[in-house]
């Protein structure tokens, strides 16, 4: 059988002894039924008995103490594990705790002659304390020893239970003993390396273990011997001492108790005390909280071992330490004792404000949802630094949980028990949540080496049925069960009493029946159903893919939150489910595919400023958060590359992040609230959406247009689904061979639109004299767009422009200087919006103008201009007034004292009238060209140039206007 640690022995033995030891059953009955009336609140000064197993405390009267001692003595003789302490109070026997560091790994012999010498020296200090009463008294000394030395450490206790003295007296005696040269010499002769510091000064007041009890996960100290010393105050120099005979015939739990006053062997001797100097020691409410937590929580025991694998930098360096604390806090609020224990591994930091820092950090953890790391990270760190030890601990953890069930339920295992162990095994790899239809849905974290689709690695994959768990139960779980069989057979081979051997025989028989069930399909389905409740992580589905700066890519997860972008191709705790199959590789302009695409972009969009602006705009498709309210309308007569570019963006991002949209979304009337709209739902969670191939003269629905472009929440639903609310996060492009008709004068709509007209045409036989005709290459449409190398290269280009946009323009498209698109947008608006055309041709900004126009005067001027230049029609003054208030003149309109709207700071030109000094057209010149210097192509590396009106690039020869 594999060697089991004492910790594992504790947890298994505690469960088993309740089954086959009548003495343990009787003790538990006594505590639960008869002594429960004496329970106290943790920390109460009335407490005299502490049960470490349950954490319960008692204030037992002397008669009940004797009953408890009797039961504990019977359990001790049967070898039962016990964890009882007595509180010393203000007046009790003396306990000396020696913690030895040895020169070797072997325990010192501590023969009776050595212990007798120690008795004499200890009594000298007691006598010198002047607290012994007059008369003749028998004083008993007991020595209990640690069962074995562990890594050069050893210990023993000296118990003088009958000598009742105050805590202050004990402290005085201990203080003088610490400097006793004779005691130090005796210990040094026994191979003790720290004789001057091995006596624990706190042993005067801390709770003391009752004999036969132990600290959790430690073996109990064993009685080596006892001495009886006779002291007579009339002859203080004559102190006979002899070894106690037949010591095992007494109730040793009772006799060695520091507070018992009714022993058969040990009779109390009451020492003098300075009552005024006494202060009753307090028992903290969380005393031994880590030990109790580890006893009752198998996962806490498991994490305790895992944390021990982390190297020192994890508790010395603040960033790593804070991550461990956050991980524990996010895993369970009950794991605070683990965090304290781990923090104390660095005494220097703990003793200089460490507790206060931990307190603050622990409280912060519940509020910092963006730092949602859990025990999964602790597992990863431990495996990274100590893979072999990690594997051994993990396997032993499964064994302990299963063993506890086997021993608790006499070898019979049911669905939930197996599911509990499976959860311990696979809880870091699988998660269950309930979807919007009320169904339990499984998610698996996909790791390298397992079957997967391209792009699923390092992400949470949705599973219809967790087939890996089904296989795992039959193939891997059986190995853990074999260890249980091995463990039971080991105990059957030991020289136990008949009743204990019979217990193990029945246990093995029942367990063998349970083992065969894990190969049964129906039984495994039952286990999986129970596992759903254990693996359930509420709201997990709602947290998936909510970070707009994270994209699932073919080779991991790409974070664009920092510049440069970071590829996460290892363990992480980001809840990512969606992905594109494209692998991220850093931008490299020397890559042949990247060169090909950069040259193609130069051909498709010949104007440098427009090319850069469009690439900046398209790069925002990789970000799925709220964006600037913009939509690009791309006009082109065909064979100009716009469709190739838009489709390439969509193919690179994949269906999870991009969608081709039905043009009817922009052109049809909005559906009523109760009707579904699957086309609109295609925008949910997408970073990119595009329209293409419209009919001639399509009229856009401006209310739908504003809804789709504006950042913020919208509502819609799929067929047969509930109404959903989601944010519009898509970068929108609408391409057409014909201009869209936008029948609105609303400036709020127009300022969200950008318009670009393609100039280039790709032909089979291009005109060599026309620089806007290029040689067509069918491979772009039929081969390149489908090639993974091409797609990977284009994705790197998008990421490059995203990073450039963040670094140079703070992520804001509107800051990118682009006179080409601005002038074309202005011209397009004027062709659609006659009111805007009137304003840009006839209304000028005139700061020195004294004339103030009533809004009705502006309405009249527009109506006259419209009838003269467009068409004669009847105008409705109220409608025109409202349109003017929503136009670009909005910022020039003010309220007059009589509460009417006036136009101030502007002048309305008459036909053929020119500008006066200091005046300027509102935004554009009379010919529709922006009042900025046009820019031209730089000689090299166009993608590196940053559009800036104050620093135009080095010019080449201007291209002719098509």
Swiss-Prot record:
It comes from the Viruses. GO terms for biological process: DNA replication. It comes from African swine fever virus (isolate Pig/Kenya/KEN-50/1950) (ASFV). PANTHER family: ATP BINDING PROTEIN-RELATED, SF3 HELICASE DOMAIN-CONTAINING PROTEIN. This is Putative primase C962R. The lineage of its organism: Viruses, Varidnaviria, Bamfordvirae, Nucleocytoviricota, Pokkesviricetes. It is an enzyme of class 3 (hydrolase). ATP binds at residues 636-643. Belongs to the asfivirus helicase C962R family. Keywords: ATP-binding, DNA replication, Helicase, Hydrolase, Late protein, Nucleotide-binding. Its EC number is 3.6.4.-. Residues 607-775 form the SF3 helicase domain. Induction: Expressed in the late phase of the viral replicative cycle. One of its GO terms (molecular function) is hydrolase activity, acting on acid anhydrides.
């Amino acid at each position: 059988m594999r060697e089991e640690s004492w910790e594992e022995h504790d947890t298994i033995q505690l469960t088993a002894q309740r089954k086959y030891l009548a003495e343990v059953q009787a003790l538990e009955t006594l505590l639960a039924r008869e002594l429960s009336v004496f329970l106290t609140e943790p920390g109460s000064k009335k407490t005299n008995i502490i049960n470490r197993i349950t954490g319960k405390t008692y204030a037992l009267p002397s008669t009940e103490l004797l009953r408890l001692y009797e039961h504990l003595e019977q359990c001790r003789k049967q070898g039962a594990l016990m964890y009882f302490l007595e509180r010393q109070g203000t007046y009790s026997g003396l306990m000396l705790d020696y913690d030895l560091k040895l020169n070797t790994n072997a325990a010192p012999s501590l023969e009776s002659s050595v212990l007798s010498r120690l008795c004499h020296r200890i009594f000298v200090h007691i006598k010198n304390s002047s607290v012994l009463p007059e008369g003749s008294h028998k004083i008993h000394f007991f020595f209990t020893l640690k069962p074995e030395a562990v890594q050069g450490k050893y210990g023993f206790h000296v118990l003088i239970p009958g000598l009742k003295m105050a805590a202050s007296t004990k402290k005085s005696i201990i203080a003088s003993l610490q400097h006793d040269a004779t005691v130090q010499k005796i210990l040094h002769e026994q191979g003790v390396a720290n004789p001057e510091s091995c006596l624990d000064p706190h042993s005067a007041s801390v709770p003391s273990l009752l004999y036969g009890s132990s600290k959790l996960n430690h073996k109990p100290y064993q009685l080596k011997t006892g001495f009886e010393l006779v002291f007579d105050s009339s002859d203080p120099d004559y102190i006979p001492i002899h070894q106690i005979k037949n010591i095992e015939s007494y109730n040793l739990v009772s006799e060695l108790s520091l507070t018992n006053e009714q022993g058969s062997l040990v009779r109390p001797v009451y020492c003098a005390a300075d009552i005024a100097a006494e202060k009753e020691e307090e028992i903290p409410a969380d005393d031994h909280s880590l030990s109790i937590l580890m006893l009752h929580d198998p996962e806490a025991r498991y994490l305790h071992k895992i944390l021990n694998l982390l190297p020192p930098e994890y508790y010395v360096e603040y960033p790593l330490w804070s991550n461990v604390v956050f991980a524990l806090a996010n895993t369970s609020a009950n794991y605070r004792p683990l965090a304290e224990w781990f923090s104390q591994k660095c005494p220097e930091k703990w003793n200089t404000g460490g507790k206060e820092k931990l307190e603050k950090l622990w409280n912060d953890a519940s509020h910092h949802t963006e730092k949602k790391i859990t025990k999964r990270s602790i597992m990863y760190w431990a495996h990274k630094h100590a893979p072999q030890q990690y594997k051994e601990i993990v396997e032993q953890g499964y064994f302990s949980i299963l063993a506890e069930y086997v021993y608790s339920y006499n070898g019979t295992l049911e669905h939930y028990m197996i599911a509990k162990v499976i959860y311990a095994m696979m809880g870091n790899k699988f998660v269950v949540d309930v979807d919007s239809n009320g169904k339990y849905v499984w998610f698996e974290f996909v790791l390298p080496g397992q079957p997967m689709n391209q792009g699923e690695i390092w992400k949470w994959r949705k599973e219809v049925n967790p087939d890996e768990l089904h296989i795992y139960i039959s193939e891997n779980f059986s190995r853990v069960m074999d260890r249980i069989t091995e463990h039971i057979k080991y105990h059957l081979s030991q020289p136990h009493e008949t009743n204990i051997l019979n217990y193990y025989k029945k246990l093995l028989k029942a367990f063998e029946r349970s083992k065969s069930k894990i190969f049964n399909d129906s039984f495994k389905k039952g286990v999986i159903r129970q596992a759903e409740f254990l693996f359930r992580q509420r709201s997990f589905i709602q947290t998936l893919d909510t970070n707009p700066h994270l994209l699932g890519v073919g080779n991991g997860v790409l974070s664009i939150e920092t510049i440069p972008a970071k590829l996460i191709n290892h363990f992480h705790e980001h809840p990512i489910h969606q992905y594109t199959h494209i692998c991220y590789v850093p931008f490299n302009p020397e890559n042949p595919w990247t060169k090909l695409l950069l040259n193609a972009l130069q051909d498709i969009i010949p104007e440098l400023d427009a090319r850069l602006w469009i690439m900046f705009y398209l790069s925002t498709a990789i970000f799925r958060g709220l964006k600037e309210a913009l939509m690009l309308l791309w006009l082109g007569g065909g064979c100009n590359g716009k469709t190739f570019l838009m489709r390439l963006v969509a193919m690179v991002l994949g269906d999870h992040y991009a969608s081709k949209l039905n043009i009817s979304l922009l052109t049809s009337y909005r559906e009523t609230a109760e009707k579904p709209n699957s086309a609109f739902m295609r925008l949910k969670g997408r970073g990119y959406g595009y329209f293409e191939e419209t009919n001639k003269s399509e009229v856009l629905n401006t209310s739908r247009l504003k809804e789709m472009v504006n950042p913020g929440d919208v509502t819609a639903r799929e067929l047969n689904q509930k109404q959903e609310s989601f944010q519009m996060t898509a970068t929108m492009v609408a391409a057409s061979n014909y201009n869209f008709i936008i029948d609105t004068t609303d400036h709020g709509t127009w300022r969200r639109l950008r318009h670009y007209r393609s100039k280039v045409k790709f032909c089979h036989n291009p005109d060599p004299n026309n620089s806007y005709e290029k040689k067509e290459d069918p491979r772009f449409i039929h081969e390149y767009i489908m090639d993974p190398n091409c797609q990977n290269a284009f994705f790197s280009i998008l990421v490059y422009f995203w990073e450039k946009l963040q670094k140079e323009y703070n992520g804001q498209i509107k800051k990118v200087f682009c006179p080409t698109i601005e002038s074309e947008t202005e011209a397009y608006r004027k062709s659609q919006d006659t009111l805007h055309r009137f304003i840009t041709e006839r209304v000028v900004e005139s700061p020195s103008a004294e004339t103030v126009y009533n809004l009705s005067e502006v309405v009249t001027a527009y109506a006259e201009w419209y009838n003269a230049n467009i068409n004669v029609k009847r105008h409705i003054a109220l409608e025109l007034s409202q349109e003017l208030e929503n136009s670009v003149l909005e910022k020039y309109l003010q309220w007059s004292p009589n509460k009417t709207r006036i136009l101030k700071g502007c002048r309305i030109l008459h036909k053929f009238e020119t500008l006066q000094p200091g005046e300027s057209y509102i935004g554009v010149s009379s010919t529709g060209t922006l009042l900025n210097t046009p820019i031209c192509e730089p000689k090299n590396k166009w993608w590196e140039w940053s559009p800036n009106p104050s620093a135009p690039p080095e010019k080449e020869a201007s291209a002719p206007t098509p």
